[in-house]
Amino acid sequence: MNIDILLGLQWGDEGKGKIVDAISPEYDIIARFQGGPNAGHSLEINNVKHVLHLIPSGIFHPEKLNIIGNGVVIDPAVFKKEIENLGPSVEELTKRLIISTRANLILPGHRILDAAYEHSKGRTKIGSTLKGIGPAYTDKVARNGLRAGEILRKDFRELYDEHLKSHLSLLRNFDFKFEITEYEAGWFEGIDMLKKFRIVNTEYLINELTGKGRKLLAEGAQGTMLDIDFGSYPFVTSSNTISAGACTGLGISPKRIGEVFGIFKAYCTRVGSGPFPTELNDETGNALRNLGHEFGSTTGRPRRCGWLDLPALKYAIMINGVTRLFMTKGDILSGFKTIKVCTGYRTEGKECLEIPFTNQAIEPVYTELPGWEENISEIREFNKLPENLRNYISFVEEQTGVPVTIVSVGADREETIFRK
C-alpha cells in the first residue's frame, strides 16, 4: 500500500498546496485526481507566492513525476498560462508532468454556459467560480465530453465545432450576452501547449510504477464539505472531493490505499453561498479574514470566516477514513484571548451532533478555550508551541480520535512543524 491521499476536510482553502509541497520529498509521484481550475493551491517558496490551479503541487521538485489524472477537467487556456508562469522552461516541465488521455476538457462553451446558468438563478445563485467546471462535468456524465487524448486526432477541430454548435444551441435559451472569439483563440493556443506534454493512459502508468514500489501521493482539490454527494448540496462542486474519488480519478484499487491525510484550518472559511454554521458576521470574523488573508486564490472573493466546526470535521474524517490530521493557520489565532470551538448543533430546540440532511438553520453549540498571545511563525518544534495552542490541538485530537502530526505556523514551506 504505497499510495497515500491528501485532501481537505472543510470547504476548501485549507492549505493543501503548501502541505503537498512540504511532504513531496517522501514521494516519487504527485497526482491530481479531481477538480479543475476552480482549485487554487497556494504555496510560498522563499517568500515567493505561487498559485496552482491544475498542476499538482509537486511540480517545484524537479525529481518528482506529476500527473493530471482522468478525474480532472482541464481548461487548456488556464493550463498554458500556468505553465508559462511557473518559472522552469516548458521543455523542463514536460519531463515532470504527464496528462491522462481520459481527462475531460473544459471548452469555451462550458465557461459561457456556467456564467449563463448562474446569471439565470438570480438570488438563488450557488456561488460558482464561473470556470466552466459544472458544465464540463455535465457533458462528461452525459457522455458528451471531449477528452485530452482526442486533441491528438486529425479531426479534432471538427469534433470541437460539433460541441460548440451544441453549446451555442443551449445558450439560445438564456437572455445572456457573451463573446467567445477572443477566449476561443487563447483556448486553441492552450491546446498547442497541451500537445507538448505526454498524454498517456495514466491508469496503466500509475499501476505499473506503484507496482514497482514507487510512492504516490494523490492530491485532492476543494474540500470534503464541497463533495457532490456528501457536501452541503446544492452548494457544492461537481466532483467527488473525498478519498474515494482518488480511486475513480486515477484508476487505482481501494486496496492500494495506505494513509489518508486530512487537512483542516484551525478555524473555518468558506467561499460562495451555502450553509456555514459557525460563520462570524462581526469584528472577529473580519479579524480572521484580514489576519489570515482570506481571499480566494482563484476568484479573489473574500472568504466567509468562522470558528472551527468539530461535527463537520468528524463527519469528514468518517467519510474519508482519515488516519492523520494536518492543521494549518494556527498562527492566525495568535492574539485571541479566547477561542471558540463548535462541538454540536442546536436545531428546533434540540441538540444534535450530526450534520442535518437539509440546509436548515442550525445554531452552533460552543466550547470556549483559552487563547495565546505568542507569535509562533519561528517555532519549529511542537513542544515549544504555546501551552494553550498545544491544549487546543489536544482538544481536537480527543474529540476526533485522530492525531495531529503536522502543524503549519506560516505560509512558507519552511514554516511547518512535523510532529513525531
Segments (PLM) and residue ranges:
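Non-transmembrane, aqueous-exposed alpha-helical and coiled segments at domain scale
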Residues: 1-420
